[in-house]
């Protein structure tokens, strides 16, 4: 259980809403409606879940023109939290996130393409001093009016990253070579929410 890891689910994470008009959005981290989460196999027997507590980001969403969409996210890697202080300390070390040297991870989209009901969001993920392309699949769950007179849209986004792609060489066993990225949430105009 001591080694588990990393994540960056984040990344991911942040994207799509269901507005009919192109608009700029900011991730709502102040209202505790946004989360950057990850999971990784633990010895092939169970899942280890974690989150990053400190992050920020923006995106532009145009339902009619996904090619114009943009996503930018910055994560403070020192904020990793797996509900275990010693493990978190190890994850921040040079064995994994190397947070002292690389205190931020970033995701910057390079393309967004519609694929049936999904949006494929491809971008450059920089983690542990390494930049690699990552694709996230985002799906609109539903949209409509909220009780306060605004518009909301719910979505789910998923992706995977390989540890070795980001120069994370600590051997966690054959079942623990990839980190699953997953975000589910809803968004409103000017804000993006992850639950």
From Swiss-Prot:
Q: Which domain of life is it from?
A: Bacteria
List the SMART domains hit by this protein, alphabetically.
YceI (SM00867)
Return the protein name: Protein YceI
- Which residues does UniProt assign to the signal peptide? 1-22
Provide the primary localization: periplasm
Any single GO CC term annotated in Swiss-Prot or TrEMBL for this entry: periplasmic space
Show the NCBIfam families listed in the entry. PRK03757.1
Species source reads: Shigella dysenteriae serotype 1 (strain Sd197)
Lipoprotein in keyword set: no
Provide the taxonomic classification: Bacteria, Pseudomonadati, Pseudomonadota, Gammaproteobacteria, Enterobacterales
Instruction: List the subcellular locations.
Output: Periplasm
